Amino acid sequence: MVHSGHGAKVTTKLAAFRRVGVMVVRELALTALLLLGVSLVVFVILHLSPGDPFSVLLEGQAPGQAARASVREALGVPTTWYGRYLAWLGHMAHGNLGTSIRTGVPVAGEIVRAGPNTLYLTLGSLLVTLLLAVPIALYSAARRTGALARALTLAVYLISAVPVFWLGYVVIYLFIHRLGLFPLLSATEPQRHSWLYVLLPIIVLGVANGTVSEVTRHLREELGRVMTEDYIRTARAKGAPVWRHAFKEGFLLPMTEMIAAKMPFVLGGAVIVEQVFNWPGLGRMALQAAQDRDFPVIMGIAMVAAAFVRLASLLRGVIYAGVNPRTATE
């Protein structure tokens, strides 16, 4: 009987892993389709937008149709928009994101160079958000009617309403120019204590992107709901640790859901923060590429951003399936 029970547990775990594996494969296939759709939409928008990437190469000259045609022919670029899209798609399928029209450098290399800076910024800001939101949410869930809980919640909402760019300029003026607490340099200047400079954009993005208030509100509501469930009341009556029973549904799942849902907004805020702080990340590179009509760079960054958002959604699905394997089949 003991061996039979152990075998049943092993079979159940294998079935759960199999369901999670099927879910991951399904999500990866969906990600490929979504990236294809994003690439098509972005390419069409760039094609319909005013300006011409070939005008960048003809800067200082009269960019007539003949000049554009000669440049297009020299670069081997198809004349139709769908021909250019299919050519780009074929190159991307082989891992080639093209070459920057402005610099002549491969787009993949530029993304690899600037990508870690944006990754540090986004992950660091999420850490700041959680360090602020989680304690306030836990305290507010436990002391819903307390004056301090209400004051903390109000303060979070007020801070989250501050525009990112405004807070960034205020922080630069106050902590760099007036108080001199942080160095006046950027990630492109690897001087002593330059790591201090990254703290300012991380804190600004983590505080003023609206995520703090959303995470606080969602965690407080979910914790309040879970704490009124019958199994929590039963655990409390038996003297069992309530937090251990409420952790998954009241904390882990809501927090994972909010992080995945707010990832696009964090990336959007990173574009503004990188511009304000002169931070050499993908957001600043995307703005420069938009000004230069550097379509290959814009397409490459759009693909990386879409893949990053989908990765956050995939991790959310894996965590959900790990907590409750039945969700992997839904």
Question: What do the predicted segments below correspond to?
Answer:
Residues 18-26, 30, 135-172:
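Cytoplasmic-entry segments and transmembrane alpha-helices of multi-pass inner-membrane transporters
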Residues 18-22, 38, 111-148, 189-330:
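Alpha-helical transmembrane segments of integral membrane proteins
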Residues 20, 28, 67, 71, ...:
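Hydrophobic alpha-helical segments of integral membrane proteins
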